[in-house]
Amino acid sequence: MKPLFLQALMYPKLMPCRNMSGVEQELMVLAKEQEKEIKGFENIKFQSSVFDSIPYEVQAKELLKGIDSLHEYTGEFNEMLDVYKTQRISEIEAMFNKSEFTMGASQEILLDNRNKNWVKQLKEIMPKNNVFVAVGAGHLPGKNGVLNLLREQGYTVRPLVNK
């Protein structure tokens, strides 16, 4: 099994809340209740190929680092949740930049290239339809983040009021 997949399986078990469905799941339920069309930017095959693009040694190193830091994850998760809920985007970027895994070529593979592809897809979709776009927190900030890339294309990007 690939280290990235093991890591993805490990993280939910470390979260402070055991019944946490995740933001993505909650949005899916709301969309279905309101009979909204749900589309994804990528299929599973593509996502798997993204992981294959990252050298096995890098994946293994990050997995071991994660295992060695298990006790820190609860605090980091709570901090990330607070930063996300209060829309402090620059702090999200700082948190992701702490990880060696999201730096350099891995950041380009995991975030930057995918963000550019998503914005390209959005440019095709948005003129024809009203859309609600949800992406993981790491995809939001930075020069190559979805927010900045949309602004560079001339879109006005505003946060939703979080109540």
Where are these regions (language model features)?
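Structured, acidic catalytic/metal-binding patches in enzyme active sites
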Residues: M1-L110
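A cross-kingdom marker for long, charged
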Residues: A105-K163
